[in-house]
Amino acid sequence: MYLSKADDQDWKYPQTEPYASGFLEVENGTHRVFWSEYGNPCGEPVICVHGGPGGGSDAFVARFFDPKRFRVLMFDQRGCGKSTPSASSNDLDDALRNNTTSHLIDDMNKLRVHRKIDTPMHVFGGSWGSTLSLSYAIAHPSNVRSLILRGIFLCRRKDSVSYTHLTLPTKA
């Protein structure tokens, strides 16, 4: 069964407010990564990796995890959401500068250290976030307890061709 945000009564875990949030300066201060945490500050750590590229984190995703059991860390990747500079502003060139998969993997690890997460994390990613989650797990296997992937997009040539040539039917 597909559950939308409108199906609030069907979700097992309630919407909660973050207990902490802030910005992490990366790349000598030229980028600031927004982060927020939900659930139990002493719980099993989960890092949520949003899709895109160009998307942003959504507090709704924290509802996948029991707030009594898990410490859910969300962040907006460089150029996305509340992170600065934003690709949706006039700072597009700045947002894209030093913004590669390697930079994002480093940001995830810096964020883990910044938030004092010293045990392996569950890594939860969707769409482009699944690709970034896999890349993080390859780069830092000792920091990953499990991978939870949804809507997997692997950035293979055939995936990209299918994605860029997707057309919707139009009315005649």
Please give the residue ranges for each predicted region.
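N-terminal targeting or regulatory segments adjacent to alpha/beta-hydrolase or S9 domains
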Residues: M1-W11
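N-terminal cap/lid segment of alpha/beta-hydrolase-fold proteins
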Residues: W11-R32
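Conserved HGGG/HGGXW glycine-rich cap/lid loop of the alpha/beta-hydrolase fold
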Residues: E27-P85
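Cap/lid segment of the alpha/beta-hydrolase catalytic domain
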Residues: G79-S102
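Short aromatic-enriched loop/helix-cap "lid" or pocket-rim segments at secondary-structure transitions
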Residues: P85-A87, K158-Y163
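Conserved acidic catalytic loop of the alpha/beta-hydrolase fold
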Residues: H103-P120
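Conserved hydrolase catalytic core segment
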Residues: P120-K158
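Conserved small/polar residues in nucleotide/adenosyl-binding loops
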Residues: T164-T170
